[in-house]
Amino acid sequence: MLGISGLIATWRPTLDTAARNAWGLSFGDGVEKAERTPSVLISEGPHRDLYRFGALWTPKGNPVLLVPPLAVSADCYDLRAGQSLAAHLLNGGNTPYLLDYGTMRYSDRGMGFEAWVDDIIPEAIRTISDLHDGAPVSLIGWSLGGTMSLLTGSAHSDLPIASITAIGTPIDYTKIPAISPLRLIGKYTGDTPLTSATNLVGGLPAPLVQASYKVTALQREVLKPWFIVRNLHNTETLARMESIDKFMAAMPGYPGKAFQQICEQLMLGNNLFHDAVTLAGREIKLSALSVPVLAVGGTTDVIAPIASVEAITSVLTGAQSVRFEKAPGSHLGLVAGPTARDSTWAFIDEFLKENAPQLVSTN
């Protein structure tokens, strides 16, 4: 039977860890310094910096473009070691690339989805394909990043796209309970209550984006103090929490026109589901998309519930194949949660392998 000294010796490492973590969270720089996957800047321009992950200059694996959503830091695909889809793809033999839109300012208020669908994303796809001797590029988009990827592929059938993966991307907005009150009001008022104030300031400011995201994870925010106390001895768990907090705090804002399009065409009009999104004066139909598509929905995602994501299977009537998978996790958890490796990432691995382009290397 252990005496007091024995008990102290047994629990000492745990107590020391808890003390270090408590200090780091309260007075220090956190419990862990986040290490990002090495990357190289390939090209740069306004809201279109393109990075390639990996230390080698010569791309060797199948090209994959990670497309972030609007109003979200591009770090969503590379939060830290263990929470990095980019690192996972790289270690799996792919060559992952990342678009970074940077910060949205008042001067960007006129940027709508067409800026990405007709310009920024196609330019990145062509650049990457050229680096790989013309090989088609696999697109992976989380949330609205998936929306923009799907619209890009639908609008530009000539682009060298191998496949598209949409993670937590809602298609049927009537299946999102959180916005039901807004849709009800919108039947009588249109998008004016949602967009009138943002039009004055040129978009949805970053603080409002950050606050709205926290509201969707209200239970997490309320229970966070208890969560920290219960896990003071678990550095990995706290580091995951900390990486998410930093990610949320770095969310940029929406440009005014894009936010208006989200309200009018996606939330109120449900135009993705009705297969009729209008950008730059012409109609884009998801049914025109021909490449293979993987869609992943989160079982606890309140921003894009399962039913809203699964609706993609009835809309993409022209796609070569449409695969839908359920994965445990919240909206961000689908991409960077503790179960992502064995669910979302595993689905992506299988899908990319099944749809790998034939031409994959350079000299």
Summary of predicted features, one role per range:
Residues 35-105:
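Short, surface-exposed "cap/lid" segments of acyl-processing enzymes
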Residues 110-131:
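Alpha/beta-hydrolase active-site loop
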Residues 1-7, 130, 134, 149-257:
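Alpha/beta-hydrolase-fold enzymes
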Residues 302-308:
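Conserved alpha/beta-hydrolase "acid-adjacent" motif
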Residues 140-145, 149:
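Gly/Ala-rich beta-loop-alpha elbow adjacent to hydrolase catalytic centers
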Residues 313-332:
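Catalytic histidine neighborhood in serine/cysteine hydrolases
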Residues 289, 295-297, 301:
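Short beta-strand/loop motif that positions the catalytic acidic residue
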Residues 328-343:
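Catalytic histidine-centered segment of alpha/beta-hydrolase-like enzymes
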